[in-house]
Amino acid sequence: MQFYAIASLFLAGTAFAAPATSPNGYDACPDGGLIGTPQCCSLDLVGVLSGECSSPSKTPNSAKEFQEICAASGQKARCCFLSEVFTLGAFCQKPVGVTA
């Protein structure tokens, strides 16, 4: 029974999180549902687990702009999974074109 509850949360999170693509075609997180949600995160543990993540204030048009949007609030640009379900912890990776 617990499996169905966890599976439902997973599906709700991936369905709710539509990837944000800018008008010029920049897609920071092209992986789609799994690690496809652009987020600004303040904690980064071992480059995989991030915490205190939130959506960027606007859709970034480039990797540089994505970094600048997140840096304005002291956070790092990341592509995350489960960030809507677990706001204090998400599995993340660096977005396309982001080096730091």
Swiss-Prot record:
Residues 1-17 form the signal peptide. One of its GO terms (cellular component) is extracellular region. Keywords: Cell wall, Disulfide bond, Secreted, Signal. Disruption phenotype: Does not affect pathogenicity in a corn seedling infection assay nor the production of microconidia. It is found in: Secreted; Secreted, Cell wall. Disulfide bonds join 29-79, 40-70, 41-53, 80-92. Belongs to the cerato-ulmin hydrophobin family. Aerial growth, conidiation, and dispersal of filamentous fungi in the environment rely upon a capability of their secreting small amphipathic proteins called hydrophobins (HPBs) with low sequence identity. Class I can self-assemble into an outermost layer of rodlet bundles on aerial cell surfaces, conferring cellular hydrophobicity that supports fungal growth, development and dispersal; whereas Class II form highly ordered films at water-air interfaces through intermolecular interactions but contribute nothing to the rodlet structure. This is Class II hydrophobin 4. It comes from Gibberella moniliformis. The gene is HYD4.
